[in-house]
Curated annotation (Swiss-Prot):
Annotated stretches, region: Flexible loop: 103-113
Catalytic activity field: L-methionine + ATP + H2O = S-adenosyl-L-methionine + phosphate + diphosphate
Localization per record: Cytoplasm
Subunit structure: Homotetramer; dimer of dimers.
GO molecular function, one term: ATP binding
GO cellular component terms, A-Z: cytoplasm
Cofactor: Mg(2+); K(+)
Pathway: Amino-acid biosynthesis; S-adenosyl-L-methionine biosynthesis; S-adenosyl-L-methionine from L-methionine: step 1/1
Binding site for L-methionine: 59, 103, 244, 275
Protein name as annotated: S-adenosylmethionine synthase
CDD domains given in the database record: S-AdoMet_synt
Organism encoding this protein: Pelagibacter ubique (strain HTCC1062)
Amino acid sequence: MSNLKNFLFTSESVSEGHPDKVSDRISDMVVDSFLSGDPFSRVACETLTTTNKVVLAGEVRGPSIKEEDLIQKVRECIKDIGYDQDGFTWREATKIESHLHAQSADIAMGVDSSSNKDEGAGDQGIMFGYACNETEELMPAPIHYSHKILRLMAEDRKSGKLKNIEPDSKSQVTFEYVDGKPTKVKSVVISSQHSADVDQAKVRELLKPYLLKSIPEKFLKDFNEEELYINPTGNFVIGGPDGDCGLTGRKIIVDTYGGAAPHGGGAFSGKDPTKVDRSAAYAARYIAKNIVASNIAEKCLIQLAYAIGVSKPLSIYVDLFDNDLEKNKFVTEKISENFDLSPRGIREMLGLNKPIYEKTAAYGHFGRVPEANGSFSWEKTDKKDVFSK
């Protein structure tokens, strides 16, 4: 984020019913399906969703899964999200194709471990992790509250409490920063698909309460309601994959820090944990979050770089945003001493060879609560004492 002290900063989120997020979820369901049968499966699954059609394509190596079983799981994903519309439904009207095939032997050769070397990275690339003390979850405020608005809407929609609202929604929150700290909300945008029998006044009445439910009152003092934009273009009846084609991996900023930190360009969903696009980004967040949780820095940016077939990162970059070279050196040394950042080391450190990915596909991969089954293990702060001087 900018080194300016006083500024406006905006982040957006999209709901689980957004067409790209439908695709992300289906791709991560495929990852979980293979990892359930073999924790060392290899998966790279892309999903396209459009009007009454879903297409899976990619490379896999692992247990044999019947195509009809995978197709049934796709329908279960669509049903859970909430789609049962003329243009996109979990029922037979939506046609599902699978074009998954075996992983390239050339890629496997570079990644598999052998007797004389550790397993290499699945590809070259750069990955970033970030944390800051703007929220309890150590996430930037704009993306955190953008996610929260949509997550609460989805919970109420699925429970039946929020009626006439359909699965496809977007949010956007602008914060005013003073002396580098978020002080108040400047504007909020909520756009949501709705049933055809409600007008925009009713939609506003239904969705306005989620502003107060999601954002702490201290940030809403003197909020001008004219800056609350709900469905600013009017009717939003046709939505989801029927309104726009969805593809896996197109919401990488929503998935991470809302633009508050750099992104290496690699998407997460549809990839097993040997892919450092995913696992190393999780590790970088884990390190950054523990650094900030230790109170040695108010915010932290980590960059990792890898080469295909090489087990150790080519570089580790640390930015604590305070120009304290001695502290930066101390933190960098502690990372090298306490974190195995080889692909295998990351997977073992965070327990990533588990079917834990489908639930990451919506509302952000970061700022979530670690669960007993290993989900969101990269959000733990169990290494914060490593960075205490």
